[in-house]
């Protein structure tokens, strides 16, 4: 009974206790509202009110259900696309959508903006010291070893063999069967299964066979989702001490997290042990995957390599499936774009090879446009190692969290024009004056930081695009993905460590007329 009451009361009890601290502490923080109110879409948007000690926690909690959109609204009305969000006990977070500031923290002052202790401590139970939760020599080592997986030869093998096999032998039969039964599929779940099989194949040389006609969910998949969600929700608490107390007493969400992480790490360690055994039994492997490279590099500690495995599952499974989920919803909402893609595919062979996939220029633009509006990672944060001043004049104190808001940047008129809300792949294209074909014209990575930028830019960007284009070709060339009627209204866009469509993506599959 004590544990139950503690679980329920903690998020409310601690902020209340803060309010009755001595008057001397009362003035440690003061309201800091630098942006005046304005009107956007007939809704009055203002910088959240800040109170002593609890900062803007009340506004944050009120908007927790739509925190990404709420923070995006504020970024867009802020004069320099940057504002300060006051946390509890004087903590400050600067949130920006300013490309100059993004370049400043991701490139120009890279060494001063790291994965700080706020980030690493919060995610250490789940991600350990994997590449997304570390800095310095450890990060450099993991990045260097992983980079060998993303050369042209590896990407070609990935597209022509791994992705194509998963399409031909698993996804296409499931979709074909669905056209006959007219049953409803959760397409978000289907895509997550597909990309999970793919990342395990290319990175670990292991096929989990998760994409099957059965809708039963594996114990690992459920544990992985729980670990991702609960770890992410730690960031939303007013004080870290709340989740730390729950962890100490092993209650509530922290008890579930411990159970989930145990299951996830058990899976990862099993992969590591099997790969070690394979390396011991064979003098050489037919194909050298990323896991083999890490184990052959002299770093054979099981816990450390398990951290790497978990991080790369996060990178390869969740982000790609998130991008494709929103892409197929947008395609249904914009039949003109779908017809353009069908037309592009009509000029390709059915069993597309690497070069044909690479030349899917319009589809590449459509995917880029989709991720502009619905980025797989809508926000990312760094922590200042030392005091600094941002290009737009904001003063950053040591230990301050600086967050760049990718979702907001994709909706800024200053970057995309008055038609920013329109799904228009042509904004990424130009006509070649000689042959009249489309040519893709990219944006600089600081205005479009969907794949991060600077030294931490995503290693798998090219592989991700190639995988997505091959999947789009395999599906759109044969089928129509038709969402349920209620999805005519924009579904909920939520995010844990990567974005999702709230409530799944229920669809029916129809055969495309030839």
Swiss-Prot record:
Residue ranges of the TM segments: 7-29
InterPro entries assigned to the protein according to its UniProt record, in alphabetical order: Cyt_P450 (IPR001128), Cyt_P450_E_grp-I (IPR002401), Cyt_P450_sf (IPR036396)
Keyword hit for Iron: yes
GO molecular function: heme binding; iron ion binding; monooxygenase activity; oxidoreductase activity, acting on paired donors, with incorporation or reduction of molecular oxygen
Keyword annotations: Endoplasmic reticulum, Heme, Iron, Membrane, Metal-binding, Monooxygenase, Oxidoreductase, Transmembrane, Transmembrane helix
Enzyme Commission number: 1.14.-.-
Alphabetized Gene3D superfamilies for the sequence: Cytochrome P450
Enzyme class (EC, first level): oxidoreductase
Cofactor: heme
Induction conditions: By clofibrate.
Main location: endoplasmic reticulum
Binding-site list for heme: 458
A UniProt-annotated Pfam family: p450
Membrane topology reported for the UniProt record: Single-pass membrane protein
Functional summary from the UniProt entry: Catalyzes the omega-hydroxylation of various fatty acids (FA) from 10 to 18 carbon atoms. The substrate specificity is higher for laurate > palmitate > myristate > linolenate > linoleate > oleate > caprate. May play a minor role in cutin synthesis and could be involved in plant defense.
PANTHER family with a match to the protein in the record: CYTOCHROME P450
Record family assignment: Belongs to the cytochrome P450 family.
Name used for this protein in its record: Cytochrome P450 94A1
Organism: Vicia sativa (Spring vetch)
Gene label: CYP94A1
């Amino acid at each position: 009974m004590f544990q139950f009451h503690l679980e329920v009361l903690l998020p409310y009890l601690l902020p209340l206790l803060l309010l009755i601290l001595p008057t001397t502490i009362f003035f440690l923080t003061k309201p800091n509202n630098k942006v005046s109110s304005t009107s956007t879409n007939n809704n009055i948007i203002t910088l959240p009110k800040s109170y002593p000690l609890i900062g803007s926690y009340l506004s944050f909690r009120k908007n927790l259900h739509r925190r990404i959109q709420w923070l995006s609204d504020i970024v867009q009305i802020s004069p320099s696309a940057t504002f300060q969000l006051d946390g509890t006990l004087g903590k400050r977070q600067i949130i920006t959508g300013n490309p100059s500031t993004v370049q400043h923290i991701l490139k120009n002052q890279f060494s001063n903006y790291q994965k700080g202790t706020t980030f690493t401590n919060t995610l250490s139970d789940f991600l350990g010291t994997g590449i997304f939760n570390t800095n310095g020599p450890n990060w450099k080592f993991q990045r260097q070893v992983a980079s060998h997986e993303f050369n042209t030869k590896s990407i070609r093998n990935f597209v022509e063999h791994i992705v194509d096999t998963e399409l031909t032998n698993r996804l296409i039969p499931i979709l074909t069967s669905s056209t006959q039964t007219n049953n409803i599929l959760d397409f978000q779940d289907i895509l997550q299964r597909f990309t999970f099989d793919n990342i395990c194949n290319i990175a670990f040389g292991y096929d989990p066979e998760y994409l099957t006609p059965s809708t039963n969910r594996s114990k690992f998949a459920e544990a992985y989702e729980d670990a991702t969600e609960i770890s992410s929700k730690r960031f939303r608490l007013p004080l870290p001490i709340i989740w730390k107390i729950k962890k100490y007493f092993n209650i509530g969400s922290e008890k579930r997290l411990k159970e989930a992480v145990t299951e996830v790490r058990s899976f990862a360690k099993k992969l590591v042990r099997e790969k070690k055994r394979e390396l011991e039994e064979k003098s050489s492997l037919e194909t050298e995957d990323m896991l083999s490279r890490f184990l052959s590099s002299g770093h054979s500690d099981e816990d450390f390599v398990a951290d790497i495995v978990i991080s790369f599952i996060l990178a390869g499974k969740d982000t790609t499936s998130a991008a494709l989920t929103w892409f197929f919803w947008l395609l249904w909402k914009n039949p003109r774009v779908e017809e353009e893609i069908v037309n592009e595919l009509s000029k390709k062979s059915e069993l597309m090879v690497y070069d044909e996939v690479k030349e899917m220029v319009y589809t590449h633009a459509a995917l880029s446009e989709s991720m502009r509006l619905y980025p797989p990672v809508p926000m990312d944060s760094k922590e200042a190692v030392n005091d600094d001043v941002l290009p737009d004049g904001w003063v950053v104190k040591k230990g301050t969290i600086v967050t760049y808001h990718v979702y907001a940047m994709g909706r800024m008129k200053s970057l995309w024009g008055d038609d920013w809300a329109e799904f228009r792949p042509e904004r990424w294209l130009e006509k070649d004056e000689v042959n009249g074909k489309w040519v893709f014209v990219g944006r600089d990575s600081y205005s479009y930081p969907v794949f991060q930028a600077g030294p931490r830019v995503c290693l798998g960007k090219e592989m991700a695009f190639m995988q997505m284009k091959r999947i789009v070709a395999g599906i759109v060339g044969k089928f129509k993905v038709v969402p349920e009627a209620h999805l005519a209204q924009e579904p909920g866009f939520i995010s844990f460590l990567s974005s999702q469509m709230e409530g799944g993506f229920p669809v029916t599959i129809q055969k495309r007329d030839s």
